[in-house]
Amino acid sequence: MLQTMKIELKKLDFSLLWRHSHDFYRVLDANRTRLQSYFFWANKKVTPNFSKTILFMIAYVVDTYYKNIKRKIANSAYDAPFVIMRDNSVAGMIGLDNISPISHDAEIWFWVSQENEGLCVATQSIKKIEDYSLNQLNLQSLYASVVYTNERSKSILTRNNYTIEDIKYNVPISRRNPTITNLIKFRKIITK
């Protein structure tokens, strides 16, 4: 019998963090080795235990709120992080960074726990965030920068009709993660 999954995207906020804090930490800790190559916050030095992980997540929520206030004042870029929930449990995260009301695009990022790989959780989440981007934010395209060795993410983006736009050599993964690598930039024009 085919079992159906309920995949939801919930905006990351204080109440969600409070309700699912232990679930967040469990998923992060179980996937730390895989995630720390791509996300600086997954490193044991940044989030070594439950309380420091939750404090980091609270700081992230505050930073997101600050960027949204700044956006309203100065029409500047902002972020929108979401928690991927599968059957009411944390399955990963997906979000939009550098949402630009001027160029009508944003950078998409995502990760799912190892136990949720191969179940189309990332694919369904990408479709949901594309719908949100188009219908709620009036964006016209999304792009993703992927470490060249991250075969899963490249495959997921390709299956979702993202195409390679650029390759950058010998660059840091992000401004917060100085690890030098090669990045592949994917882009998708989103339409109704």
Predicted feature locations:
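Acyl-donor (CoA/ACP) binding surface of acyl/acetyltransferases
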Residues: 1-23, 27-34, 81-192
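A generic alpha-helix structural signal
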Residues: 25-28, 66, 70
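Generic hydrophobic, aliphatic-rich segments that mediate packing or membrane embedding
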Residues: 61, 65, 78-80, 92
